[in-house]
């Protein structure tokens, strides 16, 4: 009798857990992440096409693949965010958490973090791996035709 009750309770607990996992997964897929700033956005598998591929037909999109546990990511992230702000919309900074979006990381063969990809016209056109100082990221952007606003261009 105790075994039957135990099996029944285990079954009910499993069903409740399954329902919660399904709800969590649905919430992740349907929820559009809020922009981090007007020049920066958090991107998911569900929003990648719109926020990266389609946006890159109007302006360059710099995609930062990062992980919360990655120390170099903690250095590069603020550098990229500050540059996105300083470039005043000349590119969009899209951030992808590889732990939350493993299929997206796999699609773009992300093996190390941070990895930064540059998209134009819906295509990946350039990339770099590892943390860089601001001047190095500026050079990378300039090499790929992404320039700061006119008032800052003289300082580059």
Task: Outline where the language-model segments fall.
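N-terminal targeting signals for export/organelle localization
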Residues: 1-38, 156
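A short beta-strand-turn-helix
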Residues: 40-61
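Short pre-active-site segment immediately N-terminal to redox-active cysteine/selenocysteine motifs
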Residues: 59-61, 66-69, 112
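Hydrophobic beta-strand anchors of alpha/beta hydrolase catalytic cores
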Residues: 62-63, 93, 116
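Typically the conserved alpha-helix immediately C-terminal to a functionally engaged Cys/Sec
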Residues: 72-88
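Structural microenvironment flanking redox-active thiols in thiol-disulfide oxidoreductases
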Residues: 94-106, 135
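Non-catalytic, surface beta->alpha helical segment in thiol-disulfide oxidoreductase systems
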Residues: 111-112, 117-155
